[in-house]
Design a protein with these regions (language model features):
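Short glycine-rich substrate-engagement loop in P-loop NTPases that contacts/grips substrate
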Residues: 1-12
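Surface-exposed alpha-helical interface segments used for non-catalytic interactions
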Residues: 2, 34-38, 74, 92, ...
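Hydrophobic "anchor" residues on beta-strands that sit immediately upstream
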Residues: 15
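Hydrophobic residues in beta-strands of the RecA-like P-loop NTPase core, especially within AAA+ ATPase
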Residues: 18-19
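Conserved catalytic/switch belt of AAA+ P-loop NTPases
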Residues: 22-60, 67-73
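A short helix-turn-beta junction within AAA+ P-loop NTPase domains corresponding to the substrate/partner-engaging
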Residues: 66-84
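Conserved AAA+ ATPase small/helical "lid" subdomain
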Residues: 80, 84-86, 94-156
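C-terminal engagement/docking regions of AAA+ P-loop ATPases
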Residues: 144-175
């Protein structure tokens, strides 16, 4: 309970953002999850004029959490659902990561990224995690690029090639 209280005190007059909040309750209460939620619910009441709490996470799991505690549910005034990114938006995020890290993609790699992100969206799998999926793809790309460069006399150390781009199966285990 003290950790929750300390965290709330740090967030007073601001926002407490709880990512993957549903992990406090996975259908069964853990001692920590139940105590944390009870403490947080009380703090939300005690500091209602000084604290905004955002519970973020997958919609269904977050609804379970909120519905598991009537006191919590009654203190949540607004609910927002954000749509998943499109394949084109995911591809733009990927390219931004590439550029921010000082790399370039050749044309074939860019086309492969567009295709990969479109394929991922078509899976309709909310567990892909949007930005997390892109980050995972980018990290695999960099690992593959490093392996390609290490095994050759390549002098271009900043261009991502088609062979560096992971396939969907590598990222999801699905075909």
């Amino acid at each position: 309970a003290q950790i929750v209280k300390d965290t709330v005190e740090q967030a007073l007059d601001g926002v407490l953002f709880i990512d993957e909040a549903y992990m406090l309750w996975d259908g069964h209460w853990t001692d920590f999850g139940q105590e944390a939620l009870a403490t947080l619910t009380k703090c939300m009441e005690d500091y209602r004029d000084r604290l905004t709490v955002i519970f973020a996470g997958y919609q269904e799991e977050t609804e379970w959490l909120i519905n598991s505690n009537a006191g919590l549910k009654s203190r949540i005034k607004y609910k927002f659902q954000f749509e998943d990114y499109t394949g084109a938006e995911l591809a733009r995020i990927y390219v931004k990561m590439v550029n921010d890290d000082g790399y370039l993609c050749n044309t074939d790699a860019l086309l492969a990224i567009d295709k990969l992100m479109d394929q991922a969206i078509k899976l309709h799998d909310p567990k892909l995690g949007n930005g997390r999926f892109v980050r995972n793809a980018f990290e695999i790309t960099l690992n593959r690029m490093a392996a390609r460069i290490a095994g050759s006399d390549c002098h271009d150390l900043s261009t991502i090639m088609l062979t560096d781009i992971p396939r969907l199966e590598e990222l999801t285990g699905k075909k």
